[in-house]
């Protein structure tokens, strides 16, 4: 991705929740219902939405939902997105609807990448974490089907207290696959019960150490969701390896293109099944609805997006931090836990006042694609 990409005009990632319908309850998707919401976007509205996203032309367009295969028009929608030049990704749970025939039809429709979930290298632990019995085995089968049809795929892991120890085991298992990318999704608690089960800031930091080490060893890209402060850790480690930070704006590694940092405060948008638009799926502050205004108008002009894109609005230690230009903290986590989407991210252990000397030395770009950045 080019460093001059203007995230004020075009999101890096656009995500559309196609449906909340799913035949199988899941611990990782709390909005599941057996049948489609009567208010979800119909086929004509969905096609119009894809046209509008196509005009924005984000590098990444992800179709997600409880189970997108519950939509009878999903193959038509994937094909339309492909024809619009959007290179669609599709996230699918391991339900009975995930079959060899479904994989084949998605490939034929022009799907660019399949996203599958794997929360542990151990079948029993994976099924326990995701809440779908037998999902580990079906995911393994889906990987084989994707390989057969030469459909690129990536794996998402939901990091939680139950699988804290599994990162190395998962990386070893994923090395045996032909995956393009491993995305480690960090939790945003929405209830007190979830908060008690959420890894601590120290455990986040420990995971960063391990992910950075693994990124040097594996053949696929490792990226993160809801952990923008992993970029801060990466920059700190690479500064140590170089013996000091380079001047602001300098490439972090010579000869490797910088990657634009993005999160819900900059460069992403999420569209719900009913057309409501949010900065991301975890930040429930609505910016508009596609039935009322265009996606471009909402993303470029709504108060929610324009305020979040300005790092000067950050408060607490995130506002003081030298790394706010490449991080910005999780605005969703700040909002859920503090009721303020501009305050500090409680999952970060970094204390910016201790590093005031580097405040003007942090680059805006990131290094190798082998190193994690934010992505769905």
Please provide the spans of the model-predicted regions:
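C-terminal accessory region of radical SAM enzymes
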Residues: 203-251, 276-329, 333
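Short Fe-S-cluster ligation motifs
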Residues: 48-66, 309, 344-376
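Canonical Radical SAM [4Fe-4S] cluster-binding loop centered on the CxxxCxxC motif
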Residues: 6-45
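Short, small/polar residue-rich loop motifs at catalytic or cofactor-binding pockets
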Residues: 262-266
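Radical SAM/AdoMet-radical enzyme domain recognition
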Residues: 27, 35, 40-64, 71-203
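Short, acidic, Ser/Thr-enriched surface-loop or helix-capping motifs
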Residues: 176, 271-272
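N-terminal [4Fe-4S]-dependent radical SAM core
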Residues: 1-17, 55, 254, 374-376
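Iron-sulfur (Fe-S) cluster-binding segments and ferredoxin-like electron-carrier domains
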Residues: 31-40, 284-291, 324-360
């Amino acid at each position: 991705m080019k460093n001059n990409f203007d995230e004020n005009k075009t999101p890096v990632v656009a995500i559309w929740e196609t449906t909340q319908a799913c035949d199988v309850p899941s611990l990782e998707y709390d909005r599941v219902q057996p049948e489609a919401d009567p208010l979800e976007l119909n086929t004509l509205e969905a096609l119009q939405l894809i046209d509008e996203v196509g005009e924005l032309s984000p590098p990444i367009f992800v179709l997600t939902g409880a189970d997108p295969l519950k939509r009878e028009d999903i193959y038509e929608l994937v094909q339309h997105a492909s024809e619009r030049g959007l290179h669609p990704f599709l996230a699918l749970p391991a339900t009975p609807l995930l079959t060899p025939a479904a994989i084949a039809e998605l490939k034929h429709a022009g799907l660019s990448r399949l996203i599958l979930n794997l929360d542990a290298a151990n079948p029993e632990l994976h099924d326990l974490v995701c809440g779908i019995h037998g999902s580990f085995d079906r995911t393994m089968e889906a990987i084989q089907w994707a390989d057969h049809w030469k459909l690129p795929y990536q794996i998402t892991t939901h990091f939680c207290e139950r699988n804290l120890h599994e990162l190395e085991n998962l990386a070893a298992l994923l090395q045996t696959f032909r995956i393009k990318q491993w995305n480690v999704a960090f939790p945003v608690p929405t209830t007190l019960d979830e908060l008690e089960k959420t890894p601590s800031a120290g455990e986040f930091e420990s995971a960063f150490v391990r992910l950075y080490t693994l990124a040097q060893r594996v053949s696929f890209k490792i990226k993160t969701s809801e952990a923008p402060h992993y970029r801060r850790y990466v920059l700190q480690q690479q500064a140590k390896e170089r013996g000091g930070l380079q001047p602001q704006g300098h490439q972090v590694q010579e000869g490797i293109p910088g990657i634009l940092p993005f999160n819900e405060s900059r460069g992403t948008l999420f569209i719900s099944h009913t057309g409501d638009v949010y900065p991301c799926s975890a930040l429930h502050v609505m910016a508009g609805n596609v039935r009322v205004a265009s996606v471009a108008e909402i993303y470029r002009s709504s108060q929610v997006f324009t305020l979040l894109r300005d790092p000067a609005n950050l408060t607490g230690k995130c506002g003081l931090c030298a790394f706010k230009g490449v991080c910005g903290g999780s605005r969703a986590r700040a909002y859920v836990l503090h009721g303020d989407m501009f305050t500090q991210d409680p999952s970060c252990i970094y204390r910016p006042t201790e590093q005031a000397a580097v405040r003007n030395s942090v680059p805006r770009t990131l290094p190798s694609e082998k190193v994690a950045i934010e992505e769905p």
